[in-house]
Amino acid sequence: MVVLDASALLAWFGGEPGADQVEQHMPCCCSTANWAEVVQKLTARGVGLGDIRSAVSLLGLVLEPVTTEDAETAATLWQDHPTLSLGDRLCLALGHRLAVPVLTADRAWSNQPPIVQIR
């Protein structure tokens, strides 16, 4: 199991570089905070919510709610990672809580464990 950040999930939806790496890590999970970002970006491009849900069912995507622990971890991550958004830090917090790697297509993230950059 791995955690996908919004950029990795969007890369998969768009058939962009790294999409194959996302598929190799099925089943996977995503924070509901990152899910909101994915849905917002795809619906802005004209993709229907039903189509989005159908597509992610192929991934075996599990949506994990943001917990109080995740929120507190994300808040403390700000000190070491001030350039990461709240959504990014919530993604990292979920990976920390589940003790699994986090896949991202975002080049701004480091490539240190538990972060795996897809290309």
Question: What spans do the regions from the language model cover?
Answer:
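Acidic catalytic patch
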Residues: 57-81
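Alpha-helix capping/helix-boundary segments
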Residues: 8-9, 34, 70, 90-91, ...
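Histidine- and aromatic-rich ligand-binding microenvironments
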Residues: 4-5, 30-32, 84-86, 106-107, ...
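Acidic, PIN/NYN-like endoribonuclease modules and their adjacent C-terminal/linker elements
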Residues: 92, 96-119
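Short, well-structured N-terminal submotif of metal-dependent ribonuclease cores
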Residues: 1-30, 41-54
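Residue-level detector of structured alpha->beta connecting loops
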Residues: 26-27, 60, 82, 99
